[in-house]
């Protein structure tokens, strides 16, 4: 069985790592280069770096920060936020990224996933999906294809600001079919709450696609990480708050997961 991965996440805006609750109420967590180096030393399996306001602000890629982070990190680095084109993938890979994450751009132009995957390989193309559970009042409305929707989760774009009307499970399946090598799945309802992953969402998407799924949004305890794997069916778990503010180390997280019978790289 393949080892399951623990991935600290650096949400960055204004050149600083931040963390919020439900995608708002951001507070400062430190310098991205220093934090990345710390996680590298702690034994993280990978790092994910997301410029969370690049798309909504219409900004270009912050390549100078990516280069600085990549110089300190010797584990796979995924970079997202403001990734719009196949050429952006080239620029990020040249800056030191190992994988690039598309979100809003894939919604605007799904073909970019196929094009990027064909040019650079599915192994370095991640599609990030920000999903939010539908309210009872949403059930029965028409989706983007004119079909009445049932219970489930909608996909949001532009840093969680815009409801696309797309169903998260169907969207994940389409992205995998077009060439995404991995799905980074974030529950907006759970983000920053420390209440645990939305395990129903994680399981629904994990069951729907054949590519690895990274569970994100809501980790507050080490058991939450293990639950994402064992109950949610995720291949990797991503967390921010519990690591950024020193509640737990990556090593503690791995030891706990190993004790729960989950294969990890120690």
Curated annotation (Swiss-Prot):
Any Pfam family matching the protein: His_biosynth
Keyword Cytoplasm (UniProt): yes
GO BP of this protein: L-histidine biosynthetic process
InterPro entries: Aldolase_TIM, His_biosynth, HisF, IGPS_HisA/HisF, RibuloseP-bd_barrel
GO CC terms in record: cytoplasm
Gene giving rise to this polypeptide: hisF
Catalytic activity: 5-[(5-phospho-1-deoxy-D-ribulos-1-ylimino)methylamino]-1-(5-phospho-beta-D-ribosyl)imidazole-4-carboxamide + L-glutamine = D-erythro-1-(imidazol-4-yl)glycerol 3-phosphate + 5-amino-1-(5-phospho-beta-D-ribosyl)imidazole-4-carboxamide + L-glutamate + H(+)
GO molecular function (one): lyase activity
UniProt pathway annotation: Amino-acid biosynthesis; L-histidine biosynthesis; L-histidine from 5-phospho-alpha-D-ribose 1-diphosphate: step 5/9
NCBIfam families, sorted: hisF (TIGR00735)
Residue stretches spanning the membrane: none
Domain of life, source organism: Bacteria
Main location: cytoplasm
Entry annotation: catalytic residues: 11, 130
Keywords assigned by UniProt, alphabetized: Amino-acid biosynthesis, Cytoplasm, Histidine biosynthesis, Lyase
SUPFAM superfamilies for this protein: Ribulose-phoshate binding barrel (SSF51366)
Name listed for the protein in its UniProt record: Imidazole glycerol phosphate synthase subunit HisF
Record note on quaternary structure: Heterodimer of HisH and HisF.
Location of this chain's protein in the cell: Cytoplasm
Family, as annotated: Belongs to the HisA/HisF family.
Top EC category: lyase
Organism: Albidiferax ferrireducens (strain ATCC BAA-621 / DSM 15236 / T118)
Keyword Lyase on entry: yes
Function: IGPS catalyzes the conversion of PRFAR and glutamine to IGP, AICAR and glutamate. The HisF subunit catalyzes the cyclization activity that produces IGP and AICAR from PRFAR using the ammonia provided by the HisH subunit.
EC number(s) per entry: 4.3.2.10
